[in-house]
Amino acid sequence: MANWQSIDELQDIASDLPRFIHALDELSRRLGLNITPLTADHISLRCHQNATAERWRRGFEQCGELLSENMINGRPICLFKLHEPVQVAHWQFSIVELPWPGEKRYPHEGWEHIEIVLPGDPETLNARALALLSDEGLSLPGISVKTSSPKGEHERLPNPTLAVTDGKTTIKFHPWSIEEIVASEQSA
């Protein structure tokens, strides 16, 4: 299998990776978030058109395997397990989340967020995630925090999300890894 960066259909996101790495580093710094000890299990894209999502899907099918395809919040989301990971900071992401466009318009097509796993009680996720962020960082202009509980059609585990964004790049926190969530769907 080919490396994802060598696939024609993925050249735009291969070129976008340095921008995302810089933006993620900058957001982490602004938030006072030390990412070094944290486990992030996947990286996600955003696009504006179904044609882009279909093209990226064709590309990922050439360099990985479809792990899951599910309807979440009214739109398809595919998870791909790549044979060669996406390198961001000290993380090696073998799982890529590819959502189709939804109602929300994102300012950029390309890499948009990472998801950090904070194992523990889902009820305490928000407090545990916020404790990692500086009060000063959270009060900066343009920084926003959102909580949600996205749920796949067959998902069995409660999977709350705390997302922190500057409007361009987002860091999300979950109590479960994406592979644990997929396993819960498959046992449904």
From Swiss-Prot:
Pfam families: YecM (PF06185). CDD domains: VOC_EcYecM_like. Signal peptide: none annotated. GO terms for cellular component: cytosol. To H.influenzae HI_1582/HI_1581. NCBIfam families: PRK11700.1-1, PRK11700.1-4, PRK11700.1-5. This is Protein YecM.
